[in-house]
Design a protein with these regions (language model features):
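Acidic Gly/Asp/Thr-rich repetitive segments characteristic of extracellular carbohydrate-active
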Residues: 157-204
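Pro/Thr/Ser/Gly-rich low-complexity, intrinsically disordered linker/stalk tracts
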Residues: 24-59, 91, 109-124
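Extracellular beta-strand/beta-solenoid scaffold signature
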Residues: 239-244, 265-275, 291-299, 320-334, ...
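Beta-strand-rich modules
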Residues: 88-106
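Right-handed parallel beta-helix
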Residues: 212-336
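Extracellular beta-rich repeat passengers
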Residues: 353, 358, 371-555
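Extracellular calcium-associated, cysteine-rich motifs in secreted modular proteins
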Residues: 556-636
Length: 636
């Protein structure tokens, strides 16, 4: 058997894997969730085997690993050492390896996929190769889909794992499929902008990986749309250069990065990475937003809205904004609006800013202002302020804010803020009326919120409200004794998986953002939040006297790539129905029948089309990992 041994194999094992020859000792930290393994290296490769090692993870007692071909599981196993040898593989074949750390029932997220290829025989490639064989159809397809057990109630969500006020959005269900085949920003077919600008129910899938630099703002003005970022091969998709604005109803956006940046000379004061208001039925899931001029992601005045499992990080504090220092997280609000399992990190303020009536175009007719459910979010390393505002939430029947299970953790940039909410009863900046306006304090339901610095307000959340304008305003000193109900568009009960505040930081750091293949930005921000490091950023590129991404971290825009095999799998879709031939074979579908993507044959409960089941299959482990350890609750 031919073998290939990497140079300094023993040295690598010593440097990267000091635990490779010893069992992991029990450190006594049984209750701690171990860190995600890092430092994966290929230590040896042969015709039919691959050997991997990795750095020891803090608090780990063992490791679980898996090897995939494409997205199909080939081998898996466990080890008490930081190394594994995987045998019985095909020669000259590309594989993806991932490993997670374990401590009893406590599991980290899987590491990013590490690509490796077995060697070919001395004779080289077969001069007359036959067609590449497709995968064997998997048995028990429905069980392999890992639909969350709590969702086996016969009710269709926007997708398996969709929760909160936007959980019943339908997006592009049953509609046309558009393939993104180029990273160029144009109005031509094959571009992302072209697909977004089409009308009618539609789903956008990606045959390419990389960064799309917008030449002008991207307006999502035609609804009934699903943007399935998880279909992109390899490292996925990033949108940069100009802002994205949602002005349409019935929108699903998943696994996309929106990193605005300050390099385009046309960016302006009001530019967010992505934002939207005055719309209905929107859900953003596992997206990453950063490097904005104004806010990373502002969504308010929307009805039946969810932002879940997103990372909003590193707004630019001292970039091109005409007011000088800025750099904010977001303005959040709405009616039946859910914000859960998100991270706000390294923002000077608006972490978030709960909206007020005078932010609307006509504050005398305030649309879509009702119940906000703010749950299991992480607020880390705020600058001048953390969460504040909310004027008038509680002034009308059925309005209020649920604050449940959130984690507030100061960082190196943080001023001392001994509260979860700086509640406002007066709006004090009304340029059109010239005086302060009484709105009343927000009425809030507070439960199980955690401040890492102040145990007293963690024990009694009512002490964690700072009444900004003093006593002489409605709702002063009052908190709700039960949570406010969140309802769907037809009055249906909305549901959400809730974790304890002590779980929130780890769950969000492990699973939030465009986490199918995390880029260096999200990995860095998650590490900052876990270990208490990092800082607020002024700008992207090196600028004298300012804190830049380039100077602090030695890079700016992560290079997003895909292997040839990953690109081939994503792009080979003979019938153009959005399900690549590889997965049609895997699921026992027909790659020459475009209609089977719209059919409902894979879901035994008749809820999701085959295309939707495929979209879930790509991220099923992420959905399961995020839900793990939580309680599925009805918001009523």
């Amino acid at each position: 058997m031919k073998k290939y041994r990497l140079i300094a194999f023993s040295l690598l094992l010593f440097l990267f894997c000091s635990c490779g020859q010893e069992k992991i000792e029990n450190s006594g930290n049984e209750g701690l969730v171990p860190a995600v393994p890092s430092g994966i290296v290929l230590t040896e490769a042969g015709n039919d085997f691959l050997s991997f090692s990795w750095e020891a993870s803090e608090n780990a007692t063992s490791y679980a690993w898996k090897l995939l071909k494409g997205m199909t599981l080939v081998k898996d196993g466990s080890s008490t050492e930081c190394a594994v040898n995987v045998n019985g593989l095909e020669e000259g074949c590309s594989y993806s390896f991932a490993v997670r750390a374990c401590r009893g029932e406590k599991l980290s997220a899987y590491s990013p996929l590490f690509e490796a290829t077995t060697l070919k025989s001395e004779g080289g490639e077969n001069p007359n190769p036959g067609p590449e064989p497709g995968p064997e159809p998997i048995e028990d397809v429905y069980e392999k889909m890992m639909i969350p057990a709590a969702e086996e109630d016969g009710i269709a969500r926007a997708f398996p794992g969709a929760e909160g006020g936007g959980m019943y959005v339908t997006g592009g269900r049953g509609g046309k499929v558009y393939h993104v085949t180029t990273l160029e920003d144009s109005s031509s077919e094959g571009s992302f902008r072209y697909a977004v600008n089409q009308k009618g129910p539609r789903t956008i899938v990606f045959d390419v990986a990389g960064t799309i630099t917008l030449n002008s703002p991207l307006q999502i003005k035609n609804g009934d749309l699903t943007i399935a970022g998880q279909t992109a091969p390899g490292d996925g998709i990033c949108i940069k250069g100009r802002y994205t604005n949602i002005t349409a109803n019935n929108i699903i956006i998943r696994f996309i990065r929106f990193r605005l940046g300050d390099e385009d000379p046309n960016v302006s004061d009001s530019d967010d990475a992505i934002w939207g208001r005055y719309c209905n039925d929107i859900i953003l899931d596992h997206c990453s937003m950063s490097w904005c001029i104004d806010e990373c992601a502002s969504f308010y005045a929307n009805e039946n809205f969810t932002m879940q499992w997103c990372i909003l990080a590193e707004s630019l504090r001292s970039s091109v904004h005409s007011k000088g220092d800025h750099g904010y997280g977001g303005i959040w609000g709405g009616s039946n609006a859910s914000f859960h399992h998100n991270m706000l990190a390294h923002h000077d303020s608006r972490n978030p800013r709960f909206d007020h009536p005078h932010i609307y175009e006509d504050h005398n007719t305030v649309p879509n202002r009702g119940v906000i459910d703010y749950r299991n979010n992480v607020v880390y390393d705020w600058g001048s302020n953390s969460s504040y505002g909310g004027e008038g939430y509680g002034a009308g029947k059925g309005t209020g804010i649920n604050m449940v299970g959130n984690c507030y953790k100061p960082g190196p940039s943080s001023t001392d803020r001994k509260y979860f909410m700086d509640a406002y009863g007066v709006y004090a900046k009304c340029s059109s009326c010239g005086s302060n306006i009484e709105e009343g304090y927000p009425l809030m339901y507070m439960s199980d919120n955690l401040h890492s610095k102040y145990a007293d307000i963690s024990a009694d959340n009512a002490l964690g409200i700072y009444w900004h304008n003093g006593e002489a305003h409605a709702n002063y000193g009052i908190t709700a004794d039960k949570p406010f109900a969140v309802k769907g568009p037809s009055g249906e009960s909305c549901k959400v998986t809730t974790h304890s505040s002590s779980q929130t930081l780890r769950q969000v750091c492990d699973w939030a953002g465009a986490s199918l293949s995390r880029d260096a930005v999200d990995r860095r921000v998650a590490e900052h939040a876990l270990n208490g490091s990092g800082k607020i950023i002024d700008c992207v590129s090196s600028t004298s006297g300012k804190v830049s991404v380039a100077d602090e971290y030695g890079f700016t825009w992560p290079l997003l790539r895909a292997s040839d095999e990953q690109k081939a799998i994503a792009a080979t879709d003979s019938d153009g129905d959005g399900i690549p031939d590889y997965y049609e074979a895997l699921f026992g579908l027909d790659s020459k029948d475009a209609n089977d993507a719209k059919s409902i044959s894979l879901d035994k409960n008749g809820r999701y089309t085959n295309l939707e089941m495929y979209l879930h299959y790509l991220v099923k482990e992420i959905v399961a990992g995020g839900n793990e350890g939580g309680s599925y609750q009805t918001l009523d």
